[in-house]
């Protein structure tokens, strides 16, 4: 079986790109464990050295989506997450944004994992907050119905990644697989705000989201962060109506003060959970400001507001009214309550 992949590997070794069908077939085979570890490593290394194309990113994501365990639901959900890998060890921003978005009336399917390069990933901080990250699909659906937000633990929904995980660990550098988390939401989110770890990925990820069927999506990188940032300028690529629009955002443009990166530095899951709790209890400052900015983007992408300034106001209301805190409490309750299958 592994001999069948040699022509494809030869193309990659020569610096050629894979067409969409070949890329999807190969990555689907990787998720079934058919190529040898050496072949998988050779392929992803060659793609990394040449640079991932939009077609390859979308094809790999499409194969991963098809191998995933989905969450069925009737909603127009949004996801707010990043690729990770920015190495800045900030507080959990997109996690907090998920609850603010739910508090503002959106249905949020938050896709995430444990920390890989950071000290506290989404799954880690949610566990510290009392969320059962190993919730059943029935519990996830209950949370989405009642709290407006569910958490989709990547390891539980993407079991096929077990075939490539050891290879990724042994390589120890970023490959195309590191870009796929935000592109493979098991709830089929058509609206997304995706943070990327480097400026060069901003436009390709937006185009890949479009190729995968997104209705409206932002791909963002903020001065070194895989988030919209209040520390400087954020680069944005928006996918909407079949085209990508590139622009930049500053915090001042939406009425928020600029922050220092040191003001956003996080710690272990307990530290970050405590900061998130204080945020929802009314603490103001740089953490609140960056959460407001990112939540505003979510409201805009979901067509809940018409401008980022309106989105900031709605995000502030979601926190100050207690609705964001209630969304967190609802997720904790739903994931720790037995629900019949």
Curated annotation (Swiss-Prot):
GO terms for cellular component: cytosol. InterPro entries: Anthranilate_Pribosyl_Tfrase, Glycosyl_Trfase_fam3, Glycosyl_Trfase_fam3_N_dom, Glycosyl_Trfase_fam3_N_dom_sf, Nuc_phospho_transferase. 5-phospho-alpha-D-ribose 1-diphosphate binds at residues 82, 85-86, 90, 92-95, 110-118, 122. Mg(2+) 1 binds at residues 94, 227. Pathway: Amino-acid biosynthesis; L-tryptophan biosynthesis; L-tryptophan from chorismate: step 2/5. Its cofactor is Mg(2+). Keywords: Amino-acid biosynthesis, Aromatic amino acid biosynthesis, Glycosyltransferase, Magnesium, Metal-binding, Transferase, Tryptophan biosynthesis. Anthranilate 2 binds at residue 168. It holds the Pfam family Glycos_transf_3. One of its GO terms (biological process) is L-tryptophan biosynthetic process. The keyword 4Fe-4S does not apply. Binds 2 magnesium ions per monomer. Homodimer. PANTHER family: ANTHRANILATE PHOSPHORIBOSYLTRANSFERASE. Catalyzes the transfer of the phosphoribosyl group of 5-phosphorylribose-1-pyrophosphate (PRPP) to anthranilate to yield N-(5'-phosphoribosyl)-anthranilate (PRA). This is Anthranilate phosphoribosyltransferase. It comes from Caulobacter vibrioides (strain NA1000 / CB15N) (Caulobacter crescentus).
